[in-house]
Every structure is written in C-alpha cells, then in structure tokens.
C-alpha cells in the first residue's frame, strides 16, 4: 500500500475548450461545481459534452453556464434532459463577488475551460475570467508558438 502523501489526484477530463486559450487572455481561473440532473451526469460520464461555444453569465447574484451541450442520455426514458439548458454553477459568495467585479470591467468575460470529474466523482467546471484577444494579439501568440517550436527543433538537432 502506498503512503498517504504519494497518492495522485486523477481528473477525468470530459470536455475541454481548447480554443479558449487562443482566443482569450486568461486572467484568473476558478473551480465551480455544476448543478446537474441524473441523465446529464450519465451523459457526461460517456464523454460526449461540448463547451466550445458556451459562456457563463451573472444573473441575480448567481453564475449560470449558458449554451453548453450535453447530449441526451440514450438509455433514458421520457425524463431525459434538454441538451442546451442553462446550468447553475456552484461557487462561494466570495468567488461570485470577485467574478461579478471582474465581469463589470470592460472587455472581461467568463468562459469555461474544461469539465472534469474530480477524485470524489463530482462534476466540476474550470471557469476562467478572461479578456478577448484582438487579431494582432492572436497573430503574435501564433508567432511565439512557432518560434518556440523551431527553437526546440534546433536544440534537439544540436544535441
């Protein structure tokens, strides 16, 4: 048996918003719980979620995930869920206050980065407070990424 301190925390990533880091400058990240129905959890466990076009919004002091896609669970009966329904996010009051003040700043938005199951089997959402990049910023980050790849190749060849 392994000692207590050496146990790894394994996250099963269900959906990831890969374009978010390219289209947005990430300012801060938060971990939020998601209020889900039973069939939504089963659908998530199948790994068929999509959060590429979704965003989070503040309404009446609560944070909601909007336009995320969790397909219907095929083995469910008539009590299935609506695939694109709004889902409430579970955050502490202090975190909601920080997010609300961040959203009120010009150009800031809340975007989901990934949905995963933590080590307790709970569905969590990694939420980011982000600022949209302009076209020239995207080009600059693409140039930096290409240059870093070239540097890596050059260093690898010189070994």
From Swiss-Prot:
<dbReference type="GO" id="GO:0003723">
    <property type="term" value="F:RNA binding"/>
</dbReference>
<keyword id="KW-0963">Cytoplasm</keyword>
<comment type="similarity">
    <text>Belongs to the SmpB family.</text>
</comment>
<protein>
    <recommendedName>
        <fullName>SsrA-binding protein</fullName>
    </recommendedName>
</protein>
<feature type="region of interest" description="Disordered">
    <location>
        <begin position="136"/>
        <end position="159"/>
    </location>
</feature>
<keyword id="KW-0694">RNA-binding</keyword>
<dbReference type="GO" id="GO:0070929">
    <property type="term" value="P:trans-translation"/>
</dbReference>
<dbReference type="InterPro" id="IPR023620">
    <property type="entry name" value="SmpB"/>
</dbReference>
<dbReference type="Pfam" id="PF01668">
    <property type="entry name" value="SmpB"/>
</dbReference>
<dbReference type="InterPro" id="IPR020081">
    <property type="entry name" value="SsrA-bd_prot_CS"/>
</dbReference>
<dbReference type="GO" id="GO:0005829">
    <property type="term" value="C:cytosol"/>
</dbReference>
<dbReference type="InterPro" id="IPR000037">
    <property type="entry name" value="SsrA-bd_prot"/>
</dbReference>
<feature type="compositionally biased region" description="Basic and acidic residues">
    <location>
        <begin position="138"/>
        <end position="159"/>
    </location>
</feature>
<comment type="function">
    <text>Required for rescue of stalled ribosomes mediated by trans-translation. Binds to transfer-messenger RNA (tmRNA), required for stable association of tmRNA with ribosomes. tmRNA and SmpB together mimic tRNA shape, replacing the anticodon stem-loop with SmpB. tmRNA is encoded by the ssrA gene; the 2 termini fold to resemble tRNA(Ala) and it encodes a 'tag peptide', a short internal open reading frame. During trans-translation Ala-aminoacylated tmRNA acts like a tRNA, entering the A-site of stalled ribosomes, displacing the stalled mRNA.</text>
</comment>
